[in-house]
Structure formats: structure tokens, C-alpha cells
């Protein structure tokens, strides 16, 4: 026996199982392109640096075989007033938190696997757990966790790498992850109580500590294995991926795009999002799965290629310790190159998510919040708001109409250029403008582009329009609003509702937040 060779083999095996925790170049590249968002706010470089520091420390810990959940945190005063918009007090005594949950998941990269027969499958990569980030705030004796969303911004020459992929259904996977966590919690409690009743967890002497710990760890491994098996059948294609992004993802992408200085030469396009793997060693062997409507078929990548292994997750083969789900993936591409791509087409004229309809919706929201406000607005503008077939407001008061024209000229530049560029109707993918800053690529045909959700957190157009309306018209007063008074007398509303409308409009006019030029 060659003892030296055997020693080297064993040493390499240990190194494979217990990585150094150093971040590899691919992970470093992914981290550099990440943007962190809370609500409608992009967190600064200082917060990003702290979060990356938490990731680096977690990677060292995760180089061991993790069994339990982990929470790493750093005290940090995150932007004065930042959390006010989220309905909480200023976050001056908070913690930035990295939370690892040990619950095996299979996060998809959206890549479609074409099969010669049967349904197409979608690739996904299995990890032992999931990493998310939060702002932790102490209120009295309680803690509140606010989710930090993640977007990745990539400079690309074209959209070709993203035209044959699906979106990860983050919202559905979050629900499944929470349900699995609740099931693990209940199962662990029941099993621990049974073990305690048998005396397996009794600790009365130092020697009992190792025995009790071993029994608990055995219980945890059994429960995690059972939870993994139960997840595989539930994570079918309908729950894992979708041809369009979720509403949460669109909101995150729109927040980032709205705060980016792209200019006329580049466009921000939301594309299918890939999760980021936190590999603790370059020698970690990936475990991939093929997702169809029946669930996930796991495969292990061996020297000769993929090899089916139903028990891969529960084997001793080192697998990816954790993955970071990405809420939105944004490709910044040259605008001029979009029109030359044979794989991209423009949206259908009937699309309900075009930028035209988004702007007209903003106008509608500004004027038609409720019947009382309709009446008051009608008194001011002297004209009734109407819409033409394109969805652009066609009949407005003089001042409002001029303002809207200026707004449309600014916001519609990208949409007009894109409409002229994207003419290939036989393409595989469709680029849909959903706001003045963001478009979404989808494998759906142009006729179904309306399924892409419009950002619901983009109120910049509405705020700016409201501010202009109230600036160019006299203050609203009950004694001058005969229509509002008539509405009250006819019983269609009540006086307090109209007064509330007045207060809202007055505060809007005086609110510095609405005086920003978008």
C-alpha cells in the first residue's frame, strides 16, 4: 500500500468537505453587481459593504457541514429617515442581518431543457439552504425584520443570453420555504419531546452532554431529510418558474431602473434572474435538477456527465451550502442593438402594460381616487378627463395638458425608439415597456405581453402630476366648490370625506417630496 498516496487522497477528501470559505472569482463578480433595496429606496455603498462582509464571514462558517439556521448581524444606523416610508420610526439603532435557513431548495436559472419527447424541463441547482437579508429593528421588547430585496445589474451587449429562459417564481418559492420551515419546527418539537420522554436527552452529568447532543443532531438530520423529500414533489414547474416575473420582482427592478442614470444610448431591461451560489470551495460538486410538472428529478454531475441519483441531497457529497435568491435581474444593453436582434420583437399594440397605459393610469389615479375628488377635480380643470385608443389622455385642462405633453415627451423617448427598433414579429421573445424607465423581456408572444405586471410602487408620475395640478390652480376651498357641496347634499358622500380630500390635496401641495422633478 502506498501510504503517501492514501494520505493525499484522504487530505483532499477532507478539503473538499471542509472548504476554506474563501470567495471564488465568480462569487466576487456577482457580489459586485448586486444592488440592495428596501421599499422604494436603494441602499448606499456603505450598507452594501457591510452586507458583503457578512457574506464573507458566513462563507467561512458554511465551509463546515451546516445543520442549524444561522443569523449574522452587524449594528448599523441605516439612513436616517429611510424606514419612515415603510411605516416605522427612523432606523438609527438597527442591525443588518444575514439569515441562513437550513431547508434544501432548488433554485432555477430559468434555462429551458428541450426534450425530444414529452414536456420541456427547466434546470435548477440544489442547495442545502437559503440566504436572505433583513434590517432588524428593536421596538420595546420586540424585534421587527424588514426584508432587503436584491437586484443584479449587468452590462450586456445584447439580450441574446436571456431570450430562452423563464423567470424564477420568487413569491411562490417564499411561500413554500415558509411552509417548510413551519413543518420542520413542529416536527422537530414533536420528535424532541418524544426523545426527552424516553430519557434520550437527559443531561445530569458531563458525559450526558455528548449523548444528548448526538441524539438531537440525529433528529435534526432526519427531519431535514423528510422535509427535503416532501419538497421535491411540490416544486413543480408551475411553482418554480413563470414566463413573466412576479409583481415583487417588477417593483424591485423598477426601483433600480428609476434611480439609474442610463441615458439615451442604453436601456434597462428586466431579464430572467439566476440565483447566486455561495460555494465554500472550488471543489464543491453541484447537484442539479430537472423540473417538470411532476416535480424535480435530481442529478449528480459526475466525470461522465449527469447521473441520476435520487438520494444526492442526503449523501455525504459536498454540495452548495447556500444560495441567494435574486429578486430582479436587470440587463443594461445598448438601445441601438435591440433593433438588430432577430430574437427580439416589440410589444403588441393591445398590450396593457405599455408605457402609454402606465402614464394614463397615473393620470387616472391622480384625478379619480374617489367620487368626491372627481367632483373637486372637475371643478378645477373645467373639462372631463377622457382617453383615446392609445391610452394617452386626450382632453385635459390647458395647464395640465401642457404639463402632460412635456412629461410624455421625456418619458416616452425610450418607448418611441424601442417601438421603431423592435419590428421582428416572428421572434422568440418580446420586450415590453412597463414604465418610463424599465422594460421586461418575456418569451410570451406580443399578443400576450399584457401579462407582464405593471410596477405598483412607481408613484413618481402621479406625485409630479398632482403637484403640478395644485400649483397651476387656486387652492381648493369648500365654499367655492359647488359640485362638492352638491355631492354632499345628495348623499353620495359625506362632508368629512370631502374635507379629507381637501386636506390631502393641501398637504400634497406643500410636501417637499412632491416637488422633485422626475
Curated annotation (Swiss-Prot):
Give the GO cellular component terms, alphabetically: virion component
From which domain of life does this come? Viruses
Q: Which UniProt keywords apply?
A: Virion
Q: What is its main location?
A: virion
* Compartments in which it is found: Virion
Q: What is this protein called?
A: Uncharacterized protein R553
